[in-house]
Design a protein with these regions (language model features):
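Transmembrane signal-anchor/signal-peptide helices with a preference for the extracytoplasmic
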Residues: 43-61
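Extracytoplasmic low-complexity, Pro/Thr/Ser/Ala/Gly-rich segments
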Residues: 56-139
């Protein structure tokens, strides 16, 4: 009987199958239905993207608004100071103008005051951008530690590990790092952030800056009294043929070389000190066991040379001896 019904079916087989599907409650996708489903899917994705972009843009504008509030508060004090410091560095990197010791420097009041410190090679001081790049990686060295006598406030408070590192002077790189969220570069990166993850990273950077770094920047602009600058002149002895790499600040500090030492009063803008001196010292091992590690020996040699440079500066700024009775004719 089924075979007879099958033989009697007329029309296209596809139409017959469609009739059977409808009668049994089943349905088949048509081209129109597939296109409609695809269109709905694309529309949903577009709607999700639009909503996400609107939310991201709202978060971006909120972050930039908070950044502008900090910039309005701190920027008018930090940016002029930054520009002045960079101008002093670039001017000092030109032809050396000869030694100069202001009477105020001889009083050595700066040694116990809060201030800023930067040391770099003369050859690297090309423009403001190069100063910022070098300062970001610069570290304090034994020269500042041997020359300055900043009171250890953390030690006086009894803070743990207060003696590990002197608080003063601030490294100029600390000031740059503390004020990074104020820069046009940072704002540009926030504006260019094209996904939620990158925007969250910038939001965390802002939160960290406000919590930990902006207080340092406020301290710098409010308390810093002087800017101590050391510019090291290159010498061929600092280049090790075996290394084959570029000359570095650490390599220079291992060998005797001329160093330009400048001191600026940040309250008046006056240059108090300008010296060209060479730090040269010899490390003499003591004890039964000599230091075998090359890295440790190099660190000791740099420390000795830098403290020797500080002694040369000490000698230059020491008050002249009082005239004797024979000199005055009495």
């Amino acid at each position: 009987m089924a075979e007879l019904r099958k033989k009697r079916e007329r029309g296209l087989p596809a139409i017959a199958r469609a009739r059977q599907d409808r009668s049994s409650g089943r349905s088949r996708w048509t081209t129109q239905a597939g296109l409609l489903a695809a269109a709905l899917l694309v529309a949903g994705l577009i709607a999700h993207k639009v909503v996400s972009e609107r939310g991201r843009e709202g978060d971006r504008q909120a972050l930039l608004a908070k950044q502008r509030a900090v910039a309005v508060t701190l920027g008018p004090e930090w940016f002029p100071l930054r520009d002045k410091l960079e101008g002093d560095v670039l001017a000092a990197a030109k032809d050396f103008a000869g030694d100069h010791v202001d009477p105020q420097a001889r009083r050595a009041e700066f040694r116990t005051q809060p201030g800023l410190y930067l040391r770099m090679r003369v050859a690297e001081a090309k423009d403001a951008a190069s100063v910022r790049t070098v300062a970001a990686d610069a570290r304090k060295d034994a020269f500042a530690a041997c020359l300055l006598r900043e009171p250890n406030e953390r030690g006086a408070r009894g803070d743990a590990d207060a003696g590990a590192f002197a608080e003063q002077p601030w490294n100029l790189g600390q000031a740059y790092a503390a004020t990074r969220i104020l820069t046009d570069d940072w704002v540009g990166e926030v504006k260019a952030a094209d996904d939620d993850l990158r925007l969250r990273i910038f939001s965390r950077q802002y939160d960290k800056a406000v919590r930990d770094e902006i207080p340092v920047a406020i301290d710098v602009v409010k308390r810093a009294q002087f800017f101590l600058l050391v510019l090291d002149e290159d010498v061929p002895e600092a280049v090790k043929p075996a290394d084959g790499g570029p000359l570095t600040e650490e390599a220079l500090q291992l060998v005797p070389h001329p160093s330009r030492v400048h001191l600026f009063d940040l309250t008046t803008g006056k240059e108090l000190l300008r010296l060209l001196r060479t730090g040269d010292a010899r490390v003499i091992p003591a004890g039964e066991r000599a230091v075998a590690d090359e890295e440790t020996r190099d660190a000791m040699q740099r420390q000795a040379n830098n403290c020797a440079l500080a002694r040369r500066v000490d000698e230059a700024i020491a008050p002249p001896p009082a005239p004797t009775a024979a000199a005055t004719g009495n």
